[in-house]
């Protein structure tokens, strides 16, 4: 059963919009839909065309992979200790709780591991919801991808933010990290993030989880929050719990209390997990699958 759950999670979290995908300096607006009120219209086509947040009270509505975001806030593209990447995606939107969390976390990074700051990947679309490419989650404004590459001690150009690749920490055989790229600084950052009370989970590649299990010393309780899943070899994924004032937000069940470093982790390196059979494509999600409040979010001016 756990193997089946893990395979399902792979589909929930992975997708083509990974940190190493290039962006564009000249993003083209999407053409209008011929019949946006058609019940069969994929929800991603509707939310993917929303270019500004819904001017409503901040609320995360629904579940991480089946919901939307009211009153989203933009993480500024530049901060003292962060820079937003792939600006052409317009995915630097989040619940104000996530934006505040990233600002506070980034300010601590130089003390945590000596990096100048964080390179921030995808958060959510302006109104959350399903995305045209990539992530099945990131719909509530409570998920954020952080590159496994230190922020340079300078401002990146727009072209660099669209074209440079993140650092792949995982060996080609996917069995462990690349010792030439994985550093104690990665462990220190992931440990600091997982210890934050607001953080519900931190998703990393199984090979990175294996390295953390091997190298962590002292208090290891934080390892329970670090969950393995495929992808996530160029970035790690922060997930916050439902914030106050979001009564329609549904949190995940707490992760198991164990470190997740024994047989539970070993399963990820079996042939069935390393070489899974392709699954059948799922039909795209429509608005009927989302909470009714998401219609109000889309309809807001």
Where are these regions (language model features)?
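Hydrophobic helical h-region of N-terminal Sec-dependent signal peptides
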Residues: 8-9, 13
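Envelope-exposed proteins and targeting segments
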Residues: 114-119, 140-144, 198, 232-236
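Solvent-exposed N-terminal domain segments of exported/luminal and surface proteins
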Residues: 22-58
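Active-site acidic/histidine clusters and adjacent loop/turn architecture
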Residues: 52-120, 182-189, 196-199
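Catalytic cores and adjacent binding grooves of peptidoglycan-active enzymes
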Residues: 20-37, 156-301
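Extended, low-complexity, intrinsically disordered C-terminal regulatory tails
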Residues: 101-133, 203-225
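Sec/Tat signal peptide C-region and signal peptidase I cleavage site
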Residues: 15-19
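Bacterial N-terminal signal peptides that target proteins for export
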Residues: 1-7
């Amino acid at each position: 059963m756990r193997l089946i759950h893990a395979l399902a999670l792979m589909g929930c979290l992975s997708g083509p919009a990974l940190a190493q995908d290039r962006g564009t300096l000249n993003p083209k607006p999407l053409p209008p839909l011929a019949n946006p009120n058609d019940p069969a219209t994929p929800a991603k086509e509707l939310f993917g065309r929303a270019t500004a947040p819904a001017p409503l009270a901040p609320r995360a509505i629904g579940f991480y992979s089946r919901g939307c975001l009211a009153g989203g806030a933009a993480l500024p593209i530049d901060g003292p200790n962060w820079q937003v990447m792939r600006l052409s995606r317009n995915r630097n939107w989040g619940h104000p709780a996530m934006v505040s969390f990233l600002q506070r976390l980034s300010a601590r990074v130089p003390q945590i591991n000596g990096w100048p700051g964080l390179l921030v990947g995808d958060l959510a679309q302006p109104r959350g919801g399903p995305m045209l490419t990539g992530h099945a989650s990131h719909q509530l404004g409570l998920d954020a991808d952080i590159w496994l590459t230190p922020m340079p001690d300078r401002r990146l150009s727009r072209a660099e933010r669209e074209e440079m690749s993140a650092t792949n920490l995982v060996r080609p055989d996917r069995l462990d990290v690349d010792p030439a790229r994985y550093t104690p600084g990665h462990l220190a950052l992931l440990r600091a993030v997982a210890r934050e009370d607001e953080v519900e989970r931190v998703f990393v590649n199984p090979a990175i989880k294996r390295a953390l299990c091997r190298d962590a010393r002292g208090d290891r309780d934080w390892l329970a929050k670090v969950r393995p899943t495929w992808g996530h070899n160029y970035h790690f994924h922060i997930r916050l719990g439902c914030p106050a004032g979001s009564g329609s937000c549904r949190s995940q069940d707490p992760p198991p209390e164990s470190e997740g470093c024994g047989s539970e982790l070993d399963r990820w390196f079996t042939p069935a997990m390393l070489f899974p059979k392709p699954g059948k494509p799922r039909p795209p999600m429509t608005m009927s699958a989302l909470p009714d409040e998401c219609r109000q979010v889309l309809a807001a001016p």
